[in-house]
Amino acid sequence: RIERLNARIENVYTADYQDMADDKLEQEKSKSSATEDNMFVTEDPYGTNTTSLYVYFTTDDAVAVSYTVHADGYTDFTRDTYQESQYSKTHEFQLLGLIPGEKNTVAITLTDADGKSRTHTIEHRGASLLGNEKVQLEKTVAADSGEDLGGGLYAILGNDSDEQDFMFYYDTNGVLRGEIPVLYYRSHRLLFDDDGLMWFSASTHHMVAMNRLGKLEKIYDLGSDYILHHDYAMDSNGDIVLLATKLGRDDNAVQDQAIKLSTSTGSVTRLVDFGELFADYKASTTHAGTDESDSNAKNRWDWLHCNTIQLLDDGSALFSARETSTIIKVDDLESDPTLDYMIGEPSVWAGTDEASSFLTKSGDFSDTGGQHSITYVADDSLPDGQYYLYMFDNNFGTSLTRPDFDWTVIDGISTELSSDTAESQYRKYLVNENAGTYTEVSSFDVPYSPYVSSAQELDNGQILIDSGMKGLFGQYNKDGDLLAQFHMTLNSSYIYRVYKYDFSGFY
């Protein structure tokens, strides 16, 4: 079954399949009256979201559209649909949220500019899932009555499997609202461009762009020189900068490159080889490590292990390096990359030129141990040259390429892969580039995850934390009080990231 499913998804991720699906959809739609009393509805025409519906109809008057999905035993799911004009006479959208295998009653509400509304109801049995994920996640901490967790959907990014891989959408009640198959490996985050496309990785080789209806408009293969890993970001031109591994290297160094993918042509260019930028440090490390983006790789040299990239408006970039527990600022990434400064424990880089580039810690707090998901936050209330930076601090001290380094130099760090007492942390820094300092402005303990994991500040001020190796994700208030938490069964070792998206302007 898995081999057949893998082959099916491989076919979905081809231009021929997507074009064929487009043609079939247009033929079927043309045979329908597609009025509000007889809407054209079909399941997942592009094979990219198992439980979704494609809906098309016209109305005599201009209306906005919203819908509510109801299935017995589950909380209702309500969304306003995106339309280019708020009120329109032609309506075409992807409807999310059906419960697989159950009778779903969908109330579609049409509202005109005067606020007058009318509702049409359709019934549809939800499609069977392709994966084995739970429809209702376990609530390890249920939100108090009246607690507002905000809108949007949790995107589960990387519950890696040896079988078929997916990205999942769950609502704030822990109910499955979308199953997006990918080729293999994982999607690391969602990027939205100015043309209404959502970009994500579908394998170590593929970046794809999906439109609002679920069609894969662009499917780019990175080619034979590089594979992607861990993260990517969109630059000011709409191109995508990716963390990458250079294939075919004599030294087998991995996860130490940044490349750029042109979203208009699919061409790939190298931006920086950190092995060249930090040649002395690389040479000082032991040839060791693994490459989880290439399970067949042998004798890898994972001396830096970048796991996050953040692009800044001035052309600089921030990188998180797990192997050195360092945050690295690089200037002019796309033209002439040079080191600006580093944040973290300086003694890791002792004896190298880079050791003098560390910002000064201001205050009494611990540095990070293998941080993930660093996020740059500009704030208009801050003077020029200052910004906030938050992250998931794994608080795990280890380095296969620095086996003799004593990580206990970092106060409170754990050196145990498995521990009943260790905690990871959410941390937020204020970085003052003018003074050359960083200080901690917020932190709290979260469930221990020595590897992977993510943190995300939400629009409502709450903080979403994924403790990946525990299979736990939840929302906290700014004081670190846990408001709600869910547990997802792990397919193998961890859930790489969980980010929340409201998908406004898309679905």
Regions found by a protein language model. Give the residues of each.
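Histidine-/acidic-rich catalytic cores in large beta-rich domains
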Residues: 3-69, 88-92, 96-103, 107-507
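Solvent-exposed serine/threonine-rich low-complexity stretches and specific carbohydrate-binding patches
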Residues: 72-86
